[in-house]
Structure formats: structure tokens, C-alpha cells
């Protein structure tokens, strides 16, 4: 029996309307969705909170980091920091906000980081997982961020200078900050805001519990066609219990939603993704001798447009990798349009060639997975194949079920579902990759 059912969660607004959008282009949401994204004003749950304001920046080099830290400290323990509409607040110094307890931040203006690459590469919070860094870290308990404003990562310079490089290259030393990070935080909610142009991942939750995002719009775009945003995932997590994303739109060049190792109790509802690498479980199993898990995820009412992947499970293979499990995952009501691989189990991650994957297969077990009511069209890049589920010979893949799959390919019909190494009946006709 699945850990999650839709009845366990409050009903949300109906699924988003779908527009035809060019990958990588800026997206202006439809009017009804725009209203969903900027609802901060009615999220006043504590109207009697004391309100703290700080001075705004005079220009893009007027750093108000000290003022922001002062305001956060004053609003802590029951107050609210108000960042006013029509005003800009420039942050040019790293901030340790790990001391928070019962605080609201009402972001109606623009909170913008400087693009001083040399400074940020020397002054940041570092996480060994995939060599991640951040501008700041938020920690503590009962933290609420809401409003109609913008959290701006000012990523263009980062995109320009990182062009041609890869985040997972062992020789990479050009680290780029993550826009929003929680560490050792409990009960964090973010509502209504826009997150714009993160230099790297947009959100990363570390060692945190009960994190929720609702009615958020995430976008990363470049004004330089030869330096597109890279690795600007919408959501990433590490050692997290309780992660909820609802009524949210994501227009980035990498994973739309991608919990990383040891993330459990996941709920996603009404998520719209354009130009992404999909709604992915993982990657996990990257580090030698380390056991990773992702389990108990319920994902429903998702639209995936113009991307590389749709519903994806990904695990590392190779000579020096780890092991673990992806377990108890449900994808339900998933709309696919112009997507290369609508449903995919990738156990040859990251960029592992066929020979190496065969010699050093993944040791991540894949169990209790449901894909239900997945419909739409692939891009045709993989020919007639619309689902590719090939299990590693070094792993157990069992209780994997597909139901109500209505996927087509512009490459022709009938559509093809590939399955190999999976124990039991998957519920639909499938064939081996060598057929």
C-alpha cells in the first residue's frame, strides 16, 4: 500500500492551463496562474505581529546586508520583516541566518544578490554534496517567507563565466551559489514569491524537516544565447523528511523537481515544468560505499513541456559509486508534451557509457513504483519509444506498475515501452531494448 494518498492532503486549485512554449524562452504565465503566484497579501496568518522595516538600496551596488541581518534579528521570535513593494534590497555579503525561531518575512519588493563572482567564490557556505555553495543559509524553526516579490540571484554573469563547463566534472572549481538554502530547519514555508535567475540550483534543503512551497514561480533565463543557465534545478534536497511543492511553475534548464539522497515523505501537486530535465527521483548512489534512499513520494497533476525527461528515476553507475533504494513512489496524472523521454528509469547516471554501465552496474534497488494516467506526446527524439524502464542487473526492480498510459510519438505508431530486468508484470505490453 502506498504511503501517500491524495486524501491525506488538502485539495488544491485545479491543474494549470498549458501553453505551447519555446524551450529556454522567458515565460509570462497565463493570467489565472499569475494570480496564483502573487497571493502573498492574503497569507497574513498573524496580523498582530510586530513589523520591522529596513532601508532599501539606492542602486545595484548599495549593499544592505547589515541592515537585512539587523531586520531579521529584530523580527525574530514572533515578528515580521517587511521588504516593501517597489523597493530593491541588494545583498552583497554572505549571511548566516541559522538562528531563526517563529519569524515571517514578507517579500513584496526585490531581494537581489550582487554578481561579484570573486567575492562569492571566496565567501559562501560550502556543502560537500556535489560541491555546492550558497549565498546564505536559513535555519531554525517556524520560518515563513511570503509575498508578491522577487528573490533574484542575478545569474547572468555566472552563466557567462560558467559556459562550457560541467558541474559534475571532477576538475570543476567554478562553484556557483544556490539561491535559497535551508540547513537544520524545521517547518519552513515559502508562498507566493518569484525566484529568478539563480546561478546554480534554485532551492536546496539540507538536514531539514517539513519544508513547503506553494504558489511559487521559478525562472532562469539568459540574455546570452551562448551561455544558457545550467544546473538551475527548481528543487533539490539532502537528508530531508517532509517536502511539499504545490501550485508552482518552473521554467529552468535542468530538473524541475529533484530530491537527492535521503529525502522521504514527498508531496507534489499541481506542478508545471517547461524546458526541464523532468520530475526526477535522484540522483542517488553517487558516493562510494554510501547508502542513499528516496522513498514515500506522491506526485500528481504535473505538466511537463519541451524537456529532456518527464517522470524519471535516476541512479549512479560506475566503478566507484554507492548503493541504496528508490521506493514507494507514485506518479499520477502526468501530462507530457514534446518531451524526449516521457517515462524513464536511468540507472546509468551520470553520462556513463553503455560499456562502463555494463561492467559497473548500479546497485540502487527500484521498488513499489506506480505510473498512472501518464498521457501526451514525446518529442520523437527516441523514435517510437515513450517509456524506457531498464533495470540494472546488479539491483532489484520489483512492483513497478504502469496503468492508463496514453503516450504517443511523432515518430510513428504504435508507441513502444521498453522494459528489462523488472520482476513481475508491469501492467502494460513492453519489449526489450534489443527487440
Swiss-Prot record:
Its EC number is 3.2.1.67. Keywords: Cell wall biogenesis/degradation, Disulfide bond, Glycoprotein, Glycosidase, Hydrolase, Repeat, Secreted, Signal. It is an enzyme of class 3 (hydrolase). The active site is at 254 (proton donor), 277. Specific in hydrolyzing the terminal glycosidic bond of polygalacturonic acid and oligogalacturonates. Pfam families: Glyco_hydro_28 (PF00295). GO terms for molecular function: galacturan 1,4-alpha-galacturonidase activity; polygalacturonase activity. The gene is pgxB. Disulfide bonds join 256-273, 391-397. InterPro entries: Glyco_hydro_28, Pectin_lyas_fold, Pectin_lyase_fold/virulence. Its main location: secreted. This is Probable exopolygalacturonase B. Residues 1-15 form the signal peptide. The keyword Transmembrane does not apply. Glycans are attached at residues 59, 184, 224, 262, 274, 301, 328, 365, 368. It catalyses: [(1->4)-alpha-D-galacturonosyl](n) + H2O = alpha-D-galacturonate + [(1->4)-alpha-D-galacturonosyl](n-1). Belongs to the glycosyl hydrolase 28 family. It is found in: Secreted. GO terms for biological process: cell wall organization; pectin catabolic process. GO terms for cellular component: extracellular region. It comes from the Eukaryota.
Amino acid at each position: 500500500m502506498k504511503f501517500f494518498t491524495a486524501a491525506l492532503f488538502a485539495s488544491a486549485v485545479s491543474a494549470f492551463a498549458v501553453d505551447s512554449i519555446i524551450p529556454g524562452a522567458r515565460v509570462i504565465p497565463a493570467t489565472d496562474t499569475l494570480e496564483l503566484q502573487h497571493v502573498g497579501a492574503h497569507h497574513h496568518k498573524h496580523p498582530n505581529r510586530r513589523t520591522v522595516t529596513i532601508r532599501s538600496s539606492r542602486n545595484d551596488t548599495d549593499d544592505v546586508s547589515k541592515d537585512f541581518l539587523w531586520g531579521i534579528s529584530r523580527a525574530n521570535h514572533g515578528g515580521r520583516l517587511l521588504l516593501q513593494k517597489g523597493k530593491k534590497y541588494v545583498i552583497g555579503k554572505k549571511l548566516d541566518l541559522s538562528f531563526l525561531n517563529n519569524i515571517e518575512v514578507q517579500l513584496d519588493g526585490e531581494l537581489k544578490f550582487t554578481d561579484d563572482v570573486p567575492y562569492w567564490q571566496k565567501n559562501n557556505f560550502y556543502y560537500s554534496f556535489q560541491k555546492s555553495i550558497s549565498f546564505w543559509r536559513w535555519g531554525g524553526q517556524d520560518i515563513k517567507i511570503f509575498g508578491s516579490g522577487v528573490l533574484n540571484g542575478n545569474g547572468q554573469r555566472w552563466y557567462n563565466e560558467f559556459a562550457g563547463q560541467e558541474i559534475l566534472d571532477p576538475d570543476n572549481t567554478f562553484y556557483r551559489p544556490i539561491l535559497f538554502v535551508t540547513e537544520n530547519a524545521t517547518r519552513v514555508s515559502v508562498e507566493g514569491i518569484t525566484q529568478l535567475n539563480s546561478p546554480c540550483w534554485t532551492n536546496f534543503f539540507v538536514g531539514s524537516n517539513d519544508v513547503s512551497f506553494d504558489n511559487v514561480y521559478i525562472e532562469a533565463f539568459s540574455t546570452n544565447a551562448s551561455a544558457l543557465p545550467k544546473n538551475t534545478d527548481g528543487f533539490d534536497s539532502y537528508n530531508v523528511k517532509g517536502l511539499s511543492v504545490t501550485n508552482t511553475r518552473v521554467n529552468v534548464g535542468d530538473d524541475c523537481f529533484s530530491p537527492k539522497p535521503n529525502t522521504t515523505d514527498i508531496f507534489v501537486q499541481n506542478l508545471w515544468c517547461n524546458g526541464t530535465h523532468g520530475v526526477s527521483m535522484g540522483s542517488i548512489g553517487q558516493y562510494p560505499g554510501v547508502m542513499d534512499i528516496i522513498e514515500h513520494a506522491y506526485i500528481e497533476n504535473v505538466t511537463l513541456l519541451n524537456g529532456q525527461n518527464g517522470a524519471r528515476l535516476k541512479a549512479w553507475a560506475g566503478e566507484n559509486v554507492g548503493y541504496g533504494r528508490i521506493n514507494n513512489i507514485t506518479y499520477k496524472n502526468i501530462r507530457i508534451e514534446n518531451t524526449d523521454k516521457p517515462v524513464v528509469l536511468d540507472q546509468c547516471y551520470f553520462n556513463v557509457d553503455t560499456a562502463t554501465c555494463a561492467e559497473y552496474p548500479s546497485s540502487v534497488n527500484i521498488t513499489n513504483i506506480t505510473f498512472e494516467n501518464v498521457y501526451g506526446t514525446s518529442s520523437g527524439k527516441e523514435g517510437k519509444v515513450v517509456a524506457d524502464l531498464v533495470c540494472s542487473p546488479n539491483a532489484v526492480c520489483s512492483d513497478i506498475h504502469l496503468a492508463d498510459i496514453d503516450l504517443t510519438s511523432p515518430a510513428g505508431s504504435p508507441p513502444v515501452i521498453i522494459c528489462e530486468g523488472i520482476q513481475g508484470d508491469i501492467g502494460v505490453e513492453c519489449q526489450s531494448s534489443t527487440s
